Amino acid sequence: PFQLVIYPLVYAIAAGNTTIIKPSEFSSHTAKAVSIMIKELFDENEVAVVEGGIPEATELLKLPFNHIHFTGSPKVGQIVMEAAAKHLTAVTLELGGKSPVIIDGTTNLNSTAEKVCWGKTLNSGQTCIAPDFALVQEDSMQEFIDGFKKSCEKFYNPDLKGIAESKDYGRIINDSNFERVQALVEDAKEKGAKIEFGGDVNKKDRYIQPTLLSNVNMDMKVMQDEIFGPILPVVSYKNNEDVTQLLNSFPSPLALYIMSNNKNNTQYFLKHTVAGGTCINELMLTSVNPNLPFGGVNNSGVGKTGGKHSFMDFSNQRGVIKRKYGNSIKLIYPPFNKQIFKYFQKVIKF
């Protein structure tokens, strides 16, 4: 929550803007810390902080801003965009969706499983670019599952005291999101999903163990909604066409991950899918290179940020033309004649 406020603020200031920021109400302690810091560093006429929830956000959206930058869910992104449209305000929307990871079996599967485990469990899966589900070539399915289990134990249970005791493993941000993620698992279990690993929860501590689900199908909510938690459904596939057919049935994701050493497979997946950004043989790096644009497409976001892209996003590219001498434009003043027509023909050819 700190990064998601400060990161765009830096670019807004760099582009010469005065700014109002509203931190998430779901991380109230961070919001308070940000408010204190900003008030110490800036005059309120330069950068102001508004704390609060939906009522405060609703009032802010009534104002005629020059630009609005929002990070959150597609559902709230639609509300922001609708409000901005009343003033024809430009928006940057960093949203989310179901970011898939494709595993074709041509990489070292232990290493691949380790990367996926890290990306899925970072901040307990509560990042907008976390891998939401995995598509694994059917011959590599069991090896990947075994590798994922080993990676979870390696990362969060090296002393064999249990993952719940790990100081490196996070918790779900609040009770409502804990209940939402838990309900996704329960719904999947009721509809036939198998828990390959994990499944333990502690409501009081808002702890959800990293959980790997197999035998999932599209009727399960875990394959319909963005998970935003440490749950990874795994789907096996036979051929590349199966992968793209499934992926293209979803709204375009914020990130697509391709774990492959096969150039033909990689190019096929790139050519036949749409995503905000793509990582090949790595996870979670679509937003860290300042030379690359970061952002979604359609349901996963509007606009691009990162490096110069953020600077331009918070700027108005204003063209200015000044005549230094002469007045050649008089050549095309009316009344029009054949000479002017010939002049236009030459200009068009040029």
Predicted regions and their residues:
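Rossmann-like NAD(P) dinucleotide-binding subdomain of oxidoreductase/dehydrogenase enzymes
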Residues: 1-111, 166, 237
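Residue-level signal for inorganic ion chemistry
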Residues: 16, 47, 68, 97, ...
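A generic structural signal for well-ordered alpha-helical segments
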Residues: 12, 84, 148, 188, ...
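Short internal beta-strands
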Residues: 20-25, 134-135, 282
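ALDH superfamily catalytic-core signature
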Residues: 42, 75-217, 280, 348-349
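Short glycine-enriched loop/turn motifs at secondary-structure junctions
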Residues: 62, 95-96, 127-129, 165-167, ...
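Conserved C-terminal structural/oligomerization subdomain of aldehyde/semialdehyde dehydrogenase
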Residues: 102, 207-350
